[in-house]
UniProtKB/Swiss-Prot annotation:
Protein name: G2-specific protein kinase fin1
Claim: Cytoplasm is one of the keywords in the record: yes
Keywords of the record: ATP-binding, Cell cycle, Cell division, Cytoplasm, Cytoskeleton, Kinase, Mitosis, Nucleotide-binding, Serine/threonine-protein kinase, Transferase
Parts forming coiled coils: none
Pfam families, alphabetized: Pkinase
Binding site for ATP: I10, G11, H12, G13, S14, F15, G16, R17, I18, K33
SUPFAM superfamilies: Protein kinase-like (PK-like)
Family membership noted in the UniProt record: Belongs to the protein kinase superfamily. Ser/Thr protein kinase family. NIMA subfamily.
Species of provenance: Schizosaccharomyces pombe (strain 972 / ATCC 24843)
Primary residence: cytoplasm
Function: Promotes chromosome condensation and nuclear envelope dynamics during mitosis. Activity appears at metaphase-anaphase transition.
Length: 722
């Protein structure tokens, strides 16, 4: 790292150039003396070393201050840094005055002379001269070290900004100790050479005084004191003391001082100690000391001011660096915040996109599900509702009437299906958990089978059975005894006994009327849920309800008690399969029956006790082993719609699908037992024996027989399902 900055070249020395430089750490101006030692002799190198050693130890206000050296071995250059004197050397000043034909004042001459004496005193005696008002030591005092300049001339005397004299360029100076008072060698300028040097006498401190006298004479007269056409003539004039010229422009005191310094006899020549004690120089010295104190104070203040300025500059520089650092930190923080905000924004956008994608997928799923499961309420009863069998609801309102006419409840979608209560077994209220596609397919198949089967049996008058009546001739119901009411059983009771108790119609007439759709609401449904006829209620005529013994004891009653109809047996199977669900599915085409009608059903909110159910189931299993079948030739083919006939001939019929789901339960049902008896009777073709085998409370005498084709198709369907 560079410590100095070169400003300009200010001169040439004995061994190189002299530059004006600036010290970077404090801005002080210095003079850099460049000395190349690569091509110089050993003696010249010793001169350089001596000068460096001398300058390190010489510190005086009138001596050029040594500031340091810098060695560059690669370039073989040594740089000496000394105090910079802004007004140049004394030789240039004399030349300028000579050109301008100006003369120095006597005070200026005495001032230069006194300052040079003080500098030589420091070199000769090794210490500063005592103050002018103090006690001077004796002249016999010998300093420990003495320095002989040996090259005092105007070119080696410098002036600073205050025109103070600075003695410099100690390149030819010789360091003497106490044992070596004189030196035999001399190298200097001939115009300032002392007589003893010309006579080859030893060189002493008084030789520097001779050179000082020559310099003061040149300052006064602006010319050399000794002149000659040749070197010999110059030497002769120096040895004789013949001065070139002298005018009376200055006082005699000045001339006497110069004359004493140019004494040819060195023994009579005064020393610096004697010259400083002269009265004429004492006054000048006092003034110089006063000026020096003022200058020192001024320099001190100036240095302090410069120091303050430097501190202010440093503080300002640090403030600028701090401000730049703050702005840089702010930019870094802002950039990092911006990056963080960008990252958070991207993450938030990604989350929003993910949420939107999930929402879109969810909405698409919901839309697809709603498109598959959408249910819209019909405007009127003539409009087909867009609902599946599981979405069908039943209106629980039944018109109460005292008339024995048949009143069938209307089907609607206002209320959900309730839990069915069937006699002979206990049903749980927990709904089976099925997946949506499986449930939709299963419910559609079950609804198709339910509707097709009921429509098939509805065409036969032999499927209509009556219920027991009590002693007073009124129709009774088991559940009325338990304090409950079943509207589906009431409707079935009314439907089955209208011909006998109401309008006295025959089974054939009732079948025809029922097939024509009389008394049924003009509404299409997709699923039928009915209940066992064991829970039938009395008709609107207000007949009483018989007890359970009416079903089993045939001898105690005089009226005929018919076995359960195929509708009730089929309902019992559905109940054992626990087919109940509120899930939504689209209506299937197979759910549309003949004329769009199906028997309505309502769910009973109450169940009988478990023991009574088991007892009834056992009784039903024992009582329905034989049936009386009335034959009606080709009634099934004539009255059954073509759609039902086709459905029964399908490869995968609803009956087969329903049989897959509940095979074990169906085999244990009463209908399977009755179906097996019918199958055996059909295989033996013993219709008379089948007719003679009647259940307790036998069939009615005027009841028509089931046609053989219808019976065979029914049994084939049961066997296929099993």
């Amino acid at each position: 790292m560079e410590k100095y900055k070169i400003l300009e070249c200010i001169g040439h020395g004995s061994f190189g150039r002299i530059y004006k430089v600036q010290r970077l750490k404090d801005g002080a101006l210095l003079a850099q003396k460049e000395i190349h030692f690569g091509n110089i002799t050993r003696q010249e190198k010793q001169y350089i070393a001596d000068e460096v050693n001398i300058l390190r130890n010489l510190k005086h206000p009138n001596i050029v201050q040594y500031c340091g050296e810098e060695l560059n071995r690669s370039a073989q250059v040594i740089n000496l840094y000394m105090e910079y004197c802004g007004h140049g050397d004394l030789a240039n000043l004399i030349q300028r005055y000579k050109e301008e034909k100006k003369r120095f004042t006597e005070q200026e001459v005495l001032k230069f002379f006194t300052q040079l004496l003080l500098a030589l005193y420091r070199c000769h005696y090794g210490e500063n001269a005592p103050a002018c008002d103090s006690q001077w030591p004796r002249e016999i005092f010998h300093p420990k070290q003495s320095v002989l300049h040996r090259d005092i001339k105007p070119a080696n005397i410098f002036l600073d900004e205050n025109n103070s004299v600075k003695l410099g360029d100690f390149g030819l100076s010789k360091l003497l100790d106490n044992t070596r008072v004189f030196t035999q060698s001399y190298v200097g300028t001939p115009y300032y050479m002392s007589p003893e040097i010309i006579r080859s006498s030893p060189y002493s401190a008084k030789s520097d005084v001779w050179a000082l006298g020559c310099v003061i004479f040149e300052i006064c007269m602006l010319t050399h004191p000794f002149e000659g056409r040749s070197y010999l003539e110059l030497q002769r004039n120096i040895c004789q003391g013949n001065l070139s010229c002298w005018d009376h422009h200055y006082s005699d005191d000045v001339f006497l001082l110069i004359r004493h310094c140019l004494e040819v006899n060195s023994d009579l020549r005064p020393t610096t100690y004697q010259l400083l004690r002269s009265p004429i120089l004492s006054d000048i010295r006092s003034k110089l000391e006063s000026e020096r104190v003022v200058l020192e104070q001024s320099d001190l203040l100036h240095k302090k001011h410069q120091m303050l300025i430097q501190l202010e500059n440093d503080l300002q520089f640090r403030e600028q660096r701090l401000s730049a650092r703050e702005s840089e930190l702010e930019n870094v923080i802002a950039s990092r915040l911006a990056q963080r905000e960008e990252i958070l924004r991207r993450e938030l956008e990604k989350q929003l996109r993910d949420m939107d994608a999930r929402y879109q997928r969810h909405m698409q799923t919901v839309v697809n599900s709603m498109q598959k499961m959408r249910v819209t309420s019909p405007v009127d009863h003539n409009e087909q509702p867009e609902s599946s069998t599981a979405e069908m609801f039943v209106d629980c309102t039944i018109e109460a009437s005292q008339s024995p006419l048949l009143h069938i409840p209307k089907l609607g979608i206002s209320k959900p299906l309730q839990t069915l209560s069937c006699p002979g077994f206990t049903l749980t209220t927990q709904q089976p958990i099925l997946k949506r596609p499986t449930l939709r397919k299963e419910l559609s198949s079950r609804a198709l089978h339910t509707t097709a089967t009921l429509m098939k049996y509805r065409a036969n008058a032999s499927s209509l059975r009556t219920t027991p009546i009590d002693k007073d001739g009124q129709i009774t119901s088991l559940q009325q005894k338990n304090g409950t009411s079943n509207q589906v059983a009431d409707c079935m009771n009314k439907l089955l006994h209208t011909s006998l108790d109401g309008k006295k119609l025959s089974p054939s007439e009732l079948c025809n009327k029922f097939s024509d759709g009389e008394g049924l609401p003009n509404r299409k449904v997709s699923k039928l849920s009915v209940e066992s006829d064991e829970t039938a209620v009395s008709a609107s005529s207000g007949e009483s309800v018989p007890t359970d013994s009416t079903l089993t004891d045939t001898k105690s009653k005089s009226v005929f008690v018919h076995p359960p109809s195929p509708q009730s047996l089929y309902v019992e199977k559905l109940e054992k399969l626990n087919i109940r669900s509120d899930e939504v599915s689209k209506p299937s085409k197979a759910s549309k029956t003949l004329h769009g009608y199906a028997l309505p059903s309502l769910a009973s909110p109450y169940d009988v006790h478990a023991e009574e159910k088991i007892a009834r189931e056992n009784e039903m299993d024992g009582n329905f082993k034989t049936m009386k079948i009335n034959q009606h030739p080709d009634e099934y083919v004539l009255r059954t719609p073509k759609k039902i006939q086709l459905l029964e001939g399908q490869k995968r019929s609803p009956v087969k699908q329903l049989g897959r789901l509940g095979y074990n339960k169906l085999r244990r049902s009463a209908m399977d037992n009755a179906g097996l008896e019918l199958r055996k009777a059909a295989s033996t073709s013993n219709y008379t024996s089948l007719q003679s085998r009647t259940l307790p409370g036998s069939w009615r005498d005027d009841e028509e027989e089931i046609p053989r084709p219808f019976l065979r198709k029914m049994l084939d369907a049961r066997m296929m399902r099993a």
